[in-house]
């Protein structure tokens, strides 16, 4: 079998800003190694020096295999970094997305490990971001946020820490939850005002429960807005 040789080594396409300085990228500069088979493989400048790659040089099969693996790794890392450039993500989200793109598991694991070590992947930072964004939108309570985080692969301990930091026992945080719940109730009341009081309360409570608000927040919100008053007066 004729040995594979290098026909050209040229600069690769421009990577993302994060890719240029991320883990396992060496100097971060990327090259395209063109083989005489027509195949193009991405490697870093450091890879070129480390493997002694030169135009016209013949490559042993094990070197070709190493370059192929390196190309696959760099491609997967670039995809992951592009996803992270859009918004923070959990490590499990990256794992799932790389799997959907048919990235081999061992390469995906290596990418996730390297990006975690470099600080680009951080489940706690992602959880804090997610909680902050969802609370700012005033749409969901802490139980729903915890469920969302767990669904995205964040551990229970990390999810609880992020929620504790955001909500905890702080009166201001509880007030923010109640304001969010009240906004949902006010919007729903327009469609529910003709219902009997007991049925209206059940529907509003179910709405807030689905959105992840605690029983305490639900009761305080409904009482503050006044929808519990007809029931409480009839009980008295």
Region locations from a protein language model:
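An alpha-helical, amphipathic repeat domain used for nucleic-acid recognition
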Residues: 1-236
């Amino acid at each position: 079998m004729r040995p594979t040789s290098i026909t050209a080594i040229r600069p690769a396409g421009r990577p993302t800003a994060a890719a240029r300085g991320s883990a396992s990228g060496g100097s971060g500069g990327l090259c395209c190694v063109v083989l005489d088979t027509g195949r193009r493989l991405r490697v870093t400048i450091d890879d070129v020096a480390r493997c002694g790659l030169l135009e016209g040089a013949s490559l042993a099969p094990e070197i070709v295999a190493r370059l192929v693996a390196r190309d696959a790794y760099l491609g997967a890392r670039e995809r992951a970094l592009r996803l992270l450039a859009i918004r923070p993500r959990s490590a499990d989200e990256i794992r799932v997305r790389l799997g959907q793109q048919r990235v081999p598991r061992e390469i995906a694991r290596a990418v996730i490990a390297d990006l975690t070590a470099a600080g680009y992947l951080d489940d706690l930072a992602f959880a804090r971001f997610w909680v902050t964004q969802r609370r700012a939108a005033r749409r969901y309570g802490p139980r729903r946020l915890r469920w969302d985080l767990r669904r995205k692969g964040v551990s229970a301990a990390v999810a609880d820490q992020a929620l504790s930091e955001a909500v905890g026992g702080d009166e201001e945080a509880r007030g923010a939850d109640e304001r969010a719940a009240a906004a949902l109730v006010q919007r729903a009341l327009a469609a529910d005002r003709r219902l009997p009081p007991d049925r209206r309360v059940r529907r509003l409570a179910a709405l807030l429960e689905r959105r992840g608000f605690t029983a305490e927040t639900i009761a305080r919100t409904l009482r503050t807005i006044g929808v519990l008053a007809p029931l409480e007066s009839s009980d008295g």
